[in-house]
Regions:
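Aromatic-anchored segments of alpha-helical transmembrane domains
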Residues: 21-29, 90-99, 159-168, 210-222
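Residue-level signature of the transmembrane alpha-helical core
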Residues: 52, 118, 122, 126, ...
C-alpha cells in the first residue's frame, strides 16, 4: 500500500490516466454484460446497476491509494460548499422548469420507476465524482497542487479527463455526434468547476452533479419520454456557449483568497502523506 501510494505521488499523471482507463474499461465491459431485458423494462435500471458497480470500482481505487478519508462527510463544509455551488442549483432549477413546461404531459410513471430514476441520477453523480474528483483530481493535486500554476493545471487536466469519456456515447450511434460533442465540451467546463470547488470534500460535487442530471432528464424519468441517448442527441452546437459560465466560475473559485486555501490544504496533505 505504501509503495503504491508513493508511486502514485511520483507518477501522478500516469496513475490518473490509468484510473481513467480502468473506469472506461469497466464502463464498456459492464454495459455489454447487462441483460437487454432490463433495458426494455426500464432504461434507468441498468443505468443504476452500471453506476453502482462503477462507484464500487472508484471506492476500490480510493482504498488502494489510501484515500478513503475523502468520503467522510462534514456538515459544516457541506453547507458552505453547497452555497458556493449556487450556480449549479440555479441552472438545474431553470432546466427543470423549462423541460417540464415544454413536455407533452403524459401519464406519470409508477412510483417504482420514479424511484429507479432518482436513484440512477444520484448514482451517476456518485460514480463519476468519486473517480474523477476523488481519485483523479486527488492524484493530480497531490503532485502539482503546491503552486498556483499547478492548481490551474490540475483543474484544467481534470476537466479534460472528465470530458473525454463522454465521447463514448457516440459509439454505435447511441447518440448523435453533435450532441455528444456538446455534452463532452460542457463536461469539461463543469468538471473544471467541480475540481475547483473540490478539495478534500466530495459530497457537494456529487449532489450538484446528480441535481444537474436529474433536471436535464426529468421528462424522461417522469413520463418515460425518450432516454439518456435521445436527450443527448437533442443538444445543438449553440449550446456549447454553456461552457463560458463554467470558465468564469472556475476563475472566480480560484481567486487569490480561495487559492491560498487550496494551497494550504494540498501542502498539508503532502506533509501528512510523507509521514505515512
Amino acid at each position: 500500500m505504501y509503495r503504491l501510494r508513493t508511486a502514485s505521488q511520483k507518477y501522478s499523471i500516469v496513475f490518473a490516466l490509468l484510473a481513467l482507463v480502468i473506469w472506461t474499461v469497466l464502463l464498456l465491459g459492464i454495459s455489454m454484460l447487462l441483460p437487454y431485458p432490463l433495458l426494455r423494462w426500464d432504461p434507468y435500471l441498468p443505468q443504476l446497476l452500471l453506476d453502482t458497480l462503477l462507484a464500487a470500482g472508484g471506492i476500490g481505487m480510493l482504498s488502494l491509494l489510501g484515500d478513503l478519508s475523502i468520503l467522510r462527510f462534514s456538515g459544516k463544509q457541506f453547507g458552505k460548499r453547497l452555497l458556493v455551488g449556487g450556480y449549479f442549483l440555479l441552472i438545474g432549477a431553470s432546466s427543470l422548469i423549462q423541460n417540464l413546461a415544454s413536455a407533452d404531459r403524459g401519464t406519470i410513471r409508477s412510483p417504482g420507476h420514479l424511484l429507479l430514476f432518482v436513484l440512477s441520477m444520484l448514482m451517476i453523480g456518485v460514480a463519476e465524482e468519486i473517480t474523477f474528483r476523488g481519485v483523479i483530481a486527488t492524484l493530480l493535486f497531490r503532485r502539482y497542487g503546491k503552486t498556483t500554476s499547478g492548481v490551474w493545471f490540475c483543474v484544467i487536466a481534470s476537466g479534460i479527463l472528465f470530458g473525454c469519456p463522454h465521447l463514448i456515447n457516440a459509439i454505435g450511434g447511441g447518440s448523435a455526434l453533435t450532441g455528444v460533442l456538446v455534452q463532452a465540451v460542457s463536461a469539461v467546463g463543469s468538471g473544471m468547476v467541480f475540481t475547483a470547488m473540490y478539495y478534500r470534500t466530495i459530497w457537494v460535487p456529487i449532489l450538484l452533479h446528480a441535481w444537474i442530471d436529474f433536471a436535464g432528464l426529468i421528462v424522461s424519468g417522469l413520463y418515460g419520454e425518450g432516454t439518456i441517448g435521445t436527450v443527448i442527441s437533442s443538444y445543438s452546437l449553440w449550446q456549447m456557449v454553456s461552457v463560458l459560465p463554467y470558465l468564469i466560475i472556475a476563475a472566480y473559485l480560484l481567486r487569490d483568497t480561495k487559492m491560498q486555501e487550496i494551497l494550504q490544504t494540498t501542502k498539508s496533505d503532502s506533509a501528512l502523506s510523507s509521514t505515512i
